[in-house]
Amino acid sequence: MATRKGSYDWRFDSGRLCLDLAATAAGSPGTADPLDRPERLADWLVRAGAVPLGTRLDGVDDHWLVRFRQLRSAVDRLLTAQLGGRAADGALERVNALAAAAPPGLCAVRAGNGALVRGLSTEPGCGALLAAVARDAVDLLTDPVALAGLRRCEGDNCRRVYLDTSRGRRRRWCSSEVCGNRERVARHRRRHTEPAGPSADREAPDP
């Protein structure tokens, strides 16, 4: 799923909140950080489901931005270590410390049509939302079943880590519609590219 915010499309196809946060740093080298200003972070938190849709996060500032980037880096190091069979104790210590705080307080409220919907008992602070993401990382990293489905995307120029819940766990890409489709297009082009030679010189294919 993607949601447009300015010129950037958020993607939430990694399967977990903490993985989606880590994926915001998974661009190609030299690309701009999508979490480059407070309003982008506020939008991401809402779209990612860290708070109920429609929640106003007017208190998000540069301090929040720094702290969420630090958490993102720690989660990314933990994921890389997990996939490589290594330890990342410094990153683990940071995530555990953030997870120890209380997450946002949830409550059920009446919507306009009378249905109960998820709401918040108080306006969430930075520490509470960091705790929500950090606790998701702790839950993931201590769940043997989930860990068995942890994968690194095989797409070109993509390093997203995702949760493979497909039958047989044979999924190769973070998103079949994005990285998977790119691979299929590239494979099609390779199959139909005319071999180099005199005929190729007469009519070069469109780029």
Where are the model-predicted features located?
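Cys/His-rich metal-chelating microdomains
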Residues: 156-161, 177, 182
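Short, intrinsically disordered low-complexity segments
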Residues: 159, 168-169, 183, 190, ...
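Basic DNA-binding region of bZIP-type proteins
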Residues: 178-195
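Cysteine-rich micro-motifs
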Residues: 168-180
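Short helix-coil boundary/hinge micro-motifs
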Residues: 1-152, 159-160, 194-207
